[in-house]
From Swiss-Prot:
SMART domains: PA2c. It catalyses: a 1,2-diacyl-sn-glycero-3-phosphocholine + H2O = a 1-acyl-sn-glycero-3-phosphocholine + a fatty acid + H(+). This is Phospholipase A2. It is found in: Secreted.
């Protein structure tokens, strides 16, 4: 499913090349960049010592954070908001990054059961871990 008015926002893309964008150009540009993230773990795939048990691809936190910023800065406020809320809030996805080991979650959203802040063991070596994405 691709969001109306876009060619890149959704599962896969409908573009006839990387330069083609839908009518919601700014939102679609954000989705295209996100789709081209170089650091990802395919559905049911493994990388960096992590296994993605989800039925969809998960990306590095760097790519997800850039996607979130891009959507927030988009002039296409309605379409960007819809895409952002769907990806970041409804899907309840996770991203991965290299960081100090998580000791515990400091703040957890009671409604969506999503971790917001973490305590880290800063004396241990960094390792790749899953992190909940922020709500949109």
């Amino acid at each position: 499913i691709i969001f109306p008015g876009t060619l890149w926002c959704g599962n896969g893309n409908l573009a006839n090349g990387t330069n083609q964008l839908g009518s919601w150009k700014e939102t679609d540009s954000c989705c295209r960049t996100h789709d081209m993230c170089p650091d990802l773990i395919e559905a049911h795939g493994s990388k960096h010592g992590l296994t993605n048990a989800a039925d969809y691809t998960r990306l590095s936190c760097e790519c997800d954070e850039e996607f979130r910023r891009c959507l927030h800065n988009s002039g296409d406020t309605v379409s960007a908001g819809f895409v952002g809320r769907t990806y970041f809030t409804v899907l309840h996805t996770q991203c991965f990054r290299l960081d100090y080991p998580i000791v515990k979650c400091k703040v957890k959203s009671t409604i969506l059961h999503r971790s917001k802040c973490y305590d880290f063991e800063t004396f241990a070596p960094k390792k790749y871990q899953w992190f909940d994405v922020l709500q949109y």
